[in-house]
């Protein structure tokens, strides 16, 4: 099995087009075409992590945070990024990162936090817009089922927790073949044909547009395929930032903070004064999530759990919501479990190892 086979499963789960514009996800170093010996799963890539991969026989390191964020003008070993790259090249190790693309999928980083907190009815806090298309096409009734099956296989027809979604309308299609045509129905240069057809409608994710159209043209019986592809303004409830849900049992603020500290295995929690009453609705965002405070308040959250809050940003709570900063590393430390779950589903016998190296650069003194 080649490394690219493993990475294909990760990208099927968290497509690269879902990453933010500033991000740098995907293969960072190495040749993904080589045979895989084992994968080391980590939040960050450091020299120590590379040493561990070498010692444990892994030639693939899968990380949440990219090692390379911005362009490099030279690789001389003058900092830890360059030294890590050089070490990976010397030992033929592939470094791969799934960052904001994994943040932005429904079953990604934020779902993992929501699961640890036992949130009910968890949903994406800030769904993205303009990431969906509606595809309409017209096909003879006898071949509608086969065409739909091909479109579904290509990724069309998914709406939230439902797949193979479509709508069909019966009708009559007309056409007159030219003398140079090669019609499936009728004859070149013949009279106008009237065919019993179905108008098929399916949703297409933006990142699968090209693949779905290719499938349509390859599987449609007509020489000239009639179709319309229309961009939608609908929110895509399966892609976006953050998550919000409800606790099964509301808690007093102090009890919730104790619960949060235990479940997220964090040394401390920085927080603002809680609003009156119990904590019922919890908004959250793994990593640095201060940009989602407005959405958390709009969702009626009693608390917003995230990391990397700056001093002056805490004032933005305005006593309307409790901000609970558990730390960047702490909020995302369980992300490696997601990588393991993705790969094990397809390759249950492949060697997947969790790093033993603590890559958190922040220490706490009490």
PLM region descriptions:
Residues 1-366:
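Hydrophobic structural segments
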């Amino acid at each position: 099995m080649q490394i690219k086979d493993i990475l294909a499963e990760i990208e099927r789960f968290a497509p690269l087009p879902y990453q933010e514009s500033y991000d740098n996800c995907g293969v960072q170093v190495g040749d993904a075409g080589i045979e895989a010996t084992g994968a080391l799963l980590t939040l960050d890539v450091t020299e120590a992590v590379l040493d561990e991969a070498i010692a444990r026989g892994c030639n693939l390191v899968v990380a949440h945070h990219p090692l390379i964020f911005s362009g490099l003008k030279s690789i001389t070993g003058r900092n830890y990024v360059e030294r890590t790259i050089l070490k990976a090249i010397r030992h033929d190790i592939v470094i791969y990162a799934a960052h904001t693309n994994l943040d932005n999928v429904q079953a990604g980083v934020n779902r993992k936090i929501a699961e640890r907190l036992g949130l009910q009815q968890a949903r994406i806090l800030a769904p993205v817009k303009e990431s969906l298309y509606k595809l309409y096409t017209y096909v003879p009734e006898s071949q509608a089922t086969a065409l739909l099956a091909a479109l579904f296989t290509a990724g069309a027809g998914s709406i939230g927790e439902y797949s193979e979604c479509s709508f069909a309308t019966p009708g009559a299609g007309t056409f007159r073949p030219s003398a140079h045509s090669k019609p499936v129905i009728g004859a070149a240069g013949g009279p106008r044909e009237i065919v019993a057809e179905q108008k098929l409608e399916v949703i297409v994710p933006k990142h699968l547009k090209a693949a779905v159209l290719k499938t349509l043209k390859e599987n449609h019986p007509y020489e000239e395929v009639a179709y319309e592809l229309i961009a939608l303004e609908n929110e895509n409830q399966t892609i976006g930032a953050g998550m919000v849900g409800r606790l099964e049992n509301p808690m007093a603020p102090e009890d919730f903070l104790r619960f949060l500290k235990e479940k997220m295995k964090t040394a401390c929690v920085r927080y603002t004064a809680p609003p009156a009453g119990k904590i019922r609705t919890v908004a959250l965002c793994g990593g640095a999530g201060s940009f989602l405070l407005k959405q958390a308040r709009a969702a009626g959250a009693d608390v917003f759990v995230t990391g990397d809050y700056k001093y002056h940003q805490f004032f933005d709570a305005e006593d309307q919501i409790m901000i609970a900063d558990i730390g960047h590393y702490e909020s995302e430390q369980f992300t490696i479990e997601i990588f393991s779950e993705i790969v094990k589903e397809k390759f249950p016998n492949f060697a997947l190892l969790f790093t033993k190296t603590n890559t958190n650069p922040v220490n706490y003194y009490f």
